[in-house]
C-alpha cells in the first residue's frame, strides 16, 4: 500500500507543478504604474487610473484596485508578461469589477493581446486575441462580452449574457478548455457554457440548403381552403356608411348660398365587410415544405478553436461616460481551482462593502433630514418675519390714518 500512496503523492505533485499562473495582479503595490504602460495613441483624450479601495470596501488595503478617475474619457493601459500558449491546457481569465459610481455608460472588460502589441499605441482597433467582461450603456446594454479573434476576424458570442449593474464588486471568469468547451462565471456561479463551434460563427455551417432542390409544383402547403359550396347571402352587400337619419338641415341653411344640404354620413350598423367563404380542411395538404439540406462543401472542422498560440499582454481599453470603476484581482492561469478559490472571496468583499455603504447611506440620510429641517425652519422664520413686517406696515397705515383724521 505504501507504493500506492507514493504514486498518489507524486501525481498530486506533478499536477501542482503543471499548474501555471501567467499573470496575477492585485494592485497591492503603490508602484503598480512601473509595470503598467499607458497608451499615447494620438487623437484620443485618455484618462488616468488611480489606486484606491473606493469610498466603501471590506478591507482598505486588500480591496485596492485601479479606478477610472475622469468622466468622458478613454482609458488605455496594459501590462506585459511572459508569453504563453494554452495548447492542450485550460485557459482561465478572471478579474473583478466594481462600478462604484453606479455606471450609466462604459466598458468594464479586458483584452488579451499577443506579443506584437505596441503598448504605447494601444487603441480600439488594435488586434487582440480575446475580449472579455461587462459592458453597460443605458437600459438596453448590460451584457458580458466574450469575443475571440479567429483568422483575423473578431467573433462575438451568439448568446446574451447579462452582467451585474449594481455598485459592488463582482468577479468575472472565463474558462476555455482544450475540448472546445467554455464557461462564463460571475461570482463563482456559472451563468453560461457550451461549445465554441456552436456559440460562435468561427466556421462555415455544417449543412446548407440544397441549391438544386425546389418545391414541387404540386406541393400543396395550404392547411385550409375556401368551401366551394359556400355562397354569399343575397343581403350581404351593404354600404359601409349611410346618411344620418336623425340629422336635420340647420334653420339658417341657405341652399342658394350654401349649396344643396346633405346629411352627414355615419357608420352603417348593417355593414358586414367583404364576404369570405368558410374555410375547410384541405384534403391535399402536405404540410410546410422543408428545403432539404446537404453537407456544406466549405465546412472545414477545426478541433483547435480554443487555441491561442501566443498571449503575453492584458489591457484595459475602455470608454467611460461616468468614471469610478475599480478593477482588481486580475488572474490568468490554467488552474481552474485556483481561480475558483480566489473568486470565493467575493462574498466577504461584498458583505463588507454593503455594510460600510449602508452605514454611509444612513449618515447621509440623517444629514439630508437635518438640512431639510433647517431649510424648513428658515422658511418658517422668513414667513414670521414677513408677517411681522406686514403687521408693522398695517399699524403704520392705521396710525397715519388716525393722524390724517386729526
UniProtKB/Swiss-Prot annotation:
The keyword Cytoplasm does not apply. An alpha-D-glucoside binds at residues 109, 111, 128, 135, 317. One of its GO terms (cellular component) is endoplasmic reticulum lumen. Residues 207-251, 352-377, 392-406 have a biased composition (Basic and acidic residues). Residues 207-259, 347-406 are annotated as: Disordered. Disulfide bonds join 105-137. PROSITE patterns: CALRETICULIN_1, CALRETICULIN_2, CALRETICULIN_REPEAT, ER_TARGET. Residues 378-391 have a biased composition (Acidic residues). GO terms for molecular function: calcium ion binding; carbohydrate binding; unfolded protein binding. Residues 1-17 form the signal peptide. GO terms for biological process: ERAD pathway; olfactory behavior; protein folding; sleep. PANTHER family: CALRETICULIN, CALRETICULIN AND CALNEXIN. Can be divided into a N-terminal globular domain, a proline-rich P-domain forming an elongated arm-like structure and a C-terminal acidic domain. The P-domain binds one molecule of calcium with high affinity, whereas the acidic C-domain binds multiple calcium ions with low affinity. Molecular calcium-binding chaperone promoting folding, oligomeric assembly and quality control in the ER via the calreticulin/calnexin cycle. This lectin may interact transiently with almost all of the monoglucosylated glycoproteins that are synthesized in the ER. This is Calreticulin. It comes from Drosophila melanogaster.
Amino acid at each position: 500500500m505504501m507504493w500506492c500512496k507514493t504514486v498518489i503523492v507524486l501525481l498530486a505533485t506533478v499536477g501542482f507543478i503543471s499548474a501555471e499562473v501567467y499573470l496575477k495582479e492585485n494592485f497591492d503595490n503603490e508602484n503598480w504604474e512601473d509595470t503598467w504602460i499607458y497608451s499615447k495613441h494620438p487623437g484620443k483624450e485618455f484618462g488616468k487610473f488611480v489606486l484606491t479601495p473606493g469610498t466603501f470596501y471590506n478591507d482598505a488595503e486588500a480591496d485596492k484596485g485601479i479606478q477610472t478617475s475622469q468622466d468622458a474619457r478613454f482609458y488605455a493601459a496594459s501590462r506585459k508578461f511572459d508569453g504563453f500558449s494554452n495548447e492542450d491546457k485550460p485557459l482561465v481569465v478572471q478579474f473583478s469589477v466594481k462600478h462604484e459610481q453606479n455606471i450609466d455608460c462604459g466598458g468594464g472588460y479586458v483584452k488579451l493581446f499577443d506579443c506584437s502589441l505596441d503598448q504605447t499605441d494601444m487603441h480600439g482597433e488594435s488586434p487582440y486575441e480575446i475580449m472579455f467582461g461587462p459592458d453597460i450603456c443605458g437600459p438596453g446594454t448590460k451584457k458580458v462580452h466574450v469575443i475571440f479573434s479567429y483568422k483575423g476576424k473578431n467573433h462575438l458570442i451568439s448568446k446574451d449574457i447579462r452582467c451585474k449593474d449594481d455598485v459592488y464588486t463582482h468577479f468575472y471568469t472565463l474558462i476555455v478548455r482544450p475540448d472546445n468547451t467554455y464557461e462564463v462565471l460571475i461570482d463563482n456561479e456559472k451563468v453560461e457554457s457550451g461549445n465554441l463551434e456552436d456559440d460562435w460563427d468561427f466556421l462555415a455551417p455544417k449543412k446548407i440548403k440544397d441549391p438544386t432542390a425546389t418545391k414541387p409544383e404540386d406541393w400543396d402547403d395550404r392547411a385550409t381552403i375556401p368551401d366551394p359550396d359556400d355562397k354569399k347571402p343575397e343581403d350581404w352587400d351593404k354600404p359601409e356608411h349611410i346618411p344620418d337619419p336623425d340629422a336635420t338641415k340647420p334653420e339658417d341653411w341657405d341652399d342658394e348660398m350654401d349649396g344643396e344640404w346633405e346629411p352627414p354620413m355615419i357608420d352603417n350598423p348593417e355593414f358586414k365587410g367583404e364576404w369570405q367563404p368558410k374555410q375547410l380542411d384541405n384534403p391535399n395538404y402536405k404540410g410546410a415544405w422543408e428545403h432539404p439540406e446537404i453537407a456544406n462543401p466549405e465546412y472545414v472542422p477545426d478541433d483547435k478553436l480554443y487555441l491561442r498560440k501566443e498571449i503575453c499582454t492584458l489591457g484595459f481599453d475602455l470608454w467611460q461616460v461616468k468614471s469610478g470603476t475599480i478593477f482588481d484581482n486580475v488572474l490568468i492561469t490554467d488552474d481552474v481551482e485556483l481561480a475558483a478559490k480566489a473568486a470565493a472571496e467575493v462574498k466577504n468583499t461584498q458583505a463588507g462593502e454593503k455594510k460600510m455603504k449602508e452605514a454611509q447611506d444612513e449618515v447621509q440620510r440623517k444629514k439630508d433630514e437635518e438640512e431639510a429641517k433647517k431649510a424648513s425652519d428658515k422658511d418658517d422664520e422668513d414667513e414670521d418675519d414677513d408677517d411681522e413686517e406686514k403687521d408693522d406696515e398695517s399699524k403704520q397705515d392705521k396710525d397715519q390714518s388716525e393722524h390724517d383724521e386729526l
